[in-house]
Curated annotation (Swiss-Prot):
This is Phosphate import ATP-binding protein PstB 1. The complex is composed of two ATP-binding proteins (PstB), two transmembrane proteins (PstC and PstA) and a solute-binding protein (PstS). It comes from Lactococcus lactis subsp. lactis (strain IL1403). It is found in: Cell membrane. NCBIfam families: 3a0107s01c2. PROSITE patterns: ABC_TRANSPORTER_1, ABC_TRANSPORTER_2, PSTB. Keywords: ATP-binding, Cell membrane, Membrane, Nucleotide-binding, Phosphate transport, Translocase, Transport. The keyword Translocase applies. The keyword Translocase applies. GO terms for molecular function: ATP binding; ATP hydrolysis activity; ATPase-coupled phosphate ion transmembrane transporter activity. ATP binds at residues 39-46. Residues 7-248 form the ABC transporter domain.
Length: 253
């Protein structure tokens, strides 16, 4: 059965001032899959990820050509509201970034911005989001304690719950486990595998093991170019490009 495309990147190039950081990228992200972006530092993988919900717009020197099509529209169209876009395409960062509020208020933050005041609804969203983020059992008795008192791995899962509360379609993750200990990282990986049943996920990772464990497709990037994009098994066991093989085998990176 053919997979449903959720988002398509077409001829995307990005410049920081005159420096080209992405060079004519073409790729498609598919529904209910995890796509891993791999490559050495500075290859453009985080820049590509941030392009998908227009986080690069916040950098004054950036210019972008090409298109990213989502729900039949180019997200770079002037008609697209970036606030609405980022509700549908949420992002989890490398360092957990909970707000200095209670766990409960972190999760409902986006709903409160939308004017939701129904306590029963907020309670339900908090429980469902924390369960989906694989952390409910750890925090259900301390919901009104500060999220800053949690471990790094717990904070990262609360940040995931905060995104889930506004019901996104796509979740972007920029090295979400690199600042975590191995046990915490494994819990976040478990969470991602559960979440892909309901969401589409794109992750930047420096860990070949992580990419091979959790992703359905892998894109290898080098010097702003998309070198190879295929199902993860093919990328790791039978890469078509020599650069991909060299990177995966540790010859550079």
């Amino acid at each position: 059965m053919e997979k449903e495309a959720v988002l398509t990147v077409s001829d995307l190039s990005l410049y920081y001032s005159k420096k080209k950081a992405l060079n004519t990228i073409n790729m498609t992200f598919y529904k209910n899959e995890i796509t891993a972006l791999i490559g050495p530092s500075g290859c453009g993988k985080s820049t590509l990820l941030r392009s998908i919900n227009r986080m690069n717009d916040l950098i004054p020197t950036v210019t972008i050509t090409g298109a990213i099509d989502y729900k039949g529209k180019n997200i770079y169209s002037p008609k697209v509201d970036t606030v609405d876009l980022r509700k549908e395409i949420g992002m989890v960062f490398q360092q957990p970034n909970p707000f200095p509020f209670s766990i409960y208020e972190n999760v409902v933050y986006g709903l409160r911005l939308k004017g939701v005041k129904d306590k029963a609804l907020l309670d339900e969203v908090v429980e469902n989001s924390l369960k989906a983020a694989n952390i409910w059992d750890e925090v259900k008795d301390i919901l009104h304690s500060s999220a800053l008192g949690l471990s790094g791995g717990q904070q990262q899962r609360v940040c995931i719950a905060r995104i889930l509360a506004v019901n996104p379609e796509i979740i972007l993750m920029d090295e979400p486990t690199s600042a975590l200990d191995p046990i915490s990282a494994a819990r976040v990986e478990e969470t991602m595998l559960e979440l892909k049943k309901d969401y589409t996920i794109a992750i930047v990772t420096h860990s070949m093991q992580q990419a091979s464990r959790i992703s359905d497709r892998t894109a290898f990037m080098l010097d702003g170019n998309l070198i190879e994009y295929n199902d993860t098994k093919s990328i790791f066991l039978n890469p078509e490009k020599q650069e991909t093989s060299d990177y995966i085998s540790g010859k550079f990176g």
